[in-house]
Amino acid sequence: SLGSLMAVSPTVRAAVVRWVTEWYETHIVYRYSGEQITGEMPQYEITDLPEGYAEDERVNWPSYVSVVYQNKDTGKTIYLDCTYMQQGSASDYVTDGVEVVSVIVNGFSGQLFLTDDWENKWNTITWIDAERNLQFEIDANVNRDVILHMAESVSLVKTEK
C-alpha cells in the first residue's frame, strides 16, 4: 500500500508530501518540503476583478510572484500571491479574530480567513495546487462571495508569442 511505501521509502514520502499544515491556537502555518524551483515562476492573474480594479504592479522573485490590483477611486488594494512550495519556506496565517472556513477553489482545498469588518480589514483566501506545487493567496477588502469568486477566476496569464 502507499502507506507502507511511504514508511519504508523517504523518496516516495517526499514525492507525496509537499507541505504540512500546522494548526496553532492563534495561527496556521503551511511548511513546504518540495524541490527548489527550476525555470521561471508561472504568471497568474485574477481574471474577474471587482469593478474599478486594475493591475497596478507585479513583483517577481525566483519562487514567488505578487500581483497588486488597485482601485484608484477608493484607494483599496487587492493582492494575489503565488508561492512555489519548496524546502525551507512557509506561509503563516493569523487566526485570532477571524473565522476559518474550509473551501474548494477549482477543485483544490483551501482556507478562507474571514473578518467581521471586511471593509476595513482584509479577508484572505488560500489554496494549494499540489500538482503544480503552488500555493495561492488573495487578500482583499471584499466579502466572502466576492473573494471566493475572484479565487475561482485565477488563471495563467496568456502570453503572446
Model-derived features with residue positions:
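Membrane-interface helical sensory segment of bacterial ECF anti-sigma factor regulators
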Residues: 1-32
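Long alpha-helical scaffolds
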Residues: 1-2, 110, 151
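Short, solvent-exposed recognition patches
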Residues: 36-131
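Short glycine-rich, low-complexity/disordered patches
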Residues: 29-36, 160-161
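Surface-exposed amphipathic alpha-helical segments
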Residues: 132, 137-161
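Residue-level marker of positions within ordered structural domains that often coincide
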Residues: 21, 58, 159
